[in-house]
């Protein structure tokens, strides 16, 4: 299968060390023996902190986005370092480059691409662009909830949801740079338009990636309706 994996920066950089990079590199290398793997890495806390600084300096949202994109590309380079020869050692800056680099048969790792697109959106657009079979989004919670699980103890995990229902749920949410708490609208629209099989799961347990690819019950499954 051709698979796009989105990994939140907060997953890889929670402790600001190399452990998660090493952990994921081993799993990705194993998966690459059977699948064509593309990875999109988020910015996480470092991106939010830098964006906060530049916003205080009076920068507009487009400039804030640019800062965030640069951080995602640094994170991508860190994962490339962990992957070594198993990955193409250059970060694509756009979808065409990602497709071209994939001709090497190696794992492709990228970050953001342009202002106003979160890495969730980038992963969904990339999946459509390369005609991926599956999109796996690894985040800091167990999947999609009916409300913020970090704020509400009674938040319930949604095991299955349609893309149309997600669009209704997300409508009106904040979309400032660095504030994406879940999928943004562009990502969901891409999933719906391309009928893309998507799973959202907790990335702190890297084994969830394997479960999602194997079709086991994990996280939230998004149905492209």
UniProtKB/Swiss-Prot annotation:
Q: Kindly list the positions annotated as binding UMP.
A: 43, 65, 113-119
Compartments where located:
Cytoplasm
Q: Which UniProt keywords apply?
A: ATP-binding, Cytoplasm, Kinase, Nucleotide-binding, Pyrimidine biosynthesis, Transferase
One of the GO BP terms on file: UDP biosynthetic process
- Main location per the UniProt record: cytoplasm
Q: What is its EC number?
A: 2.7.4.22
As for family, the record states: Belongs to the UMP kinase family.
Protein name, per record: Uridylate kinase
What is the species listed in this Swiss-Prot or TrEMBL entry? Methanobrevibacter smithii (strain ATCC 35061 / DSM 861 / OCM 144 / PS)
